[in-house]
Amino acid sequence: MVTDVAVTRAANIVTVLGGPTALIHLAGWTLLTDPTFDAAGTEYQNGPVMVRKTADPALKPSQLPALDAVVVSHTGHQDNLDTAGRTVASGASKVFTTVAGAKDLGGAAVGLEPWQTRTLSKPGRTPLNITAVPARHGPVGTEAITGPVTGFLLHTDDGSAPTVYVSGDTVDLDAMSALADRYRVDVALLHLGAAGFEEFGDIRLSLTAVQAVEARRLLGDPLVVAVHAEGWAHYTEDRSHVQQLFDAAGVPLHWPTPGQPITLPDPHTR
């Protein structure tokens, strides 16, 4: 009889927990992205803007499996690392983030420069590479306001597991094109929602649906899983709008139900 843990270890699965937060079981490793575990209704003053969480996470921190690593796209915004999420990250044995984020978190956090790779390795497991992908949290010129951010590519040298791109909060399509020039991308967790605030006018700080359709093309048509699109009040494009634009473009989109696992395709397949 195969145990649930063994099944999880053998499968390549993504489980979105809400907002940008996802559990990724890949090549026998378990990773968590951008931990957000505070309760719905929590508000945060972030510089000139207020951010408000509108949905509870699908799992509480106490319900998480053992984590091999946590990847944090940036530490300065609570919709990517809230109070409870920061506690989860601080307690992890391995954390990968931006250089500035590592200084912020301290402890086990490792800051990665663009295109820098670190590898998870243990006896009996396929090594898993974590490569930092350049990102920009808004249009050119907003960097001083938004701060540094990074995406991540999770990949194996032997190609035995699907290659998974976690975009982080970015609208940098040129970086995605550069990523596709370097690596095959089988699955893309794209941070959607077209995040915006009245104080910033028409500036959007994460991908619009139109940008996401183009991002998929540039990345080589991977399976797209929508994250960072529900659960916070500052997302300006809702599910129906995003789905409508993807359907109009004839582009498939996997919109997850929080807490429900998604089995990833085999490498080289769509």
How would you label these PLM feature ranges?
Residues 53, 100, 171-260:
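Cap/insert and terminal regions of metallo-dependent hydrolase folds
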Residues 24, 34, 74, 82, ...:
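Divalent metal-coordination and catalytic microenvironments
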Residues 7-60, 144-168:
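Conserved beta-strand hairpin/beta-sheet module of binuclear metal-dependent hydrolase folds
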Residues 38-40, 75-81, 102-105, 116-119, ...:
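Active-site environment of divalent metal-dependent phosphoester hydrolases
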Residues 29-31, 68-69, 94, 128, ...:
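Structural motif
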Residues 65-68, 131-205, 256-269:
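Mobile, glycine- and charge-enriched loop segments
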Residues 2-4, 29-72, 83-86, 139-143, ...:
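Pre-active-site segment of Zn-dependent metallo-hydrolases
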Residues 2-9, 94-161, 245-267:
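Metallo-beta-lactamase
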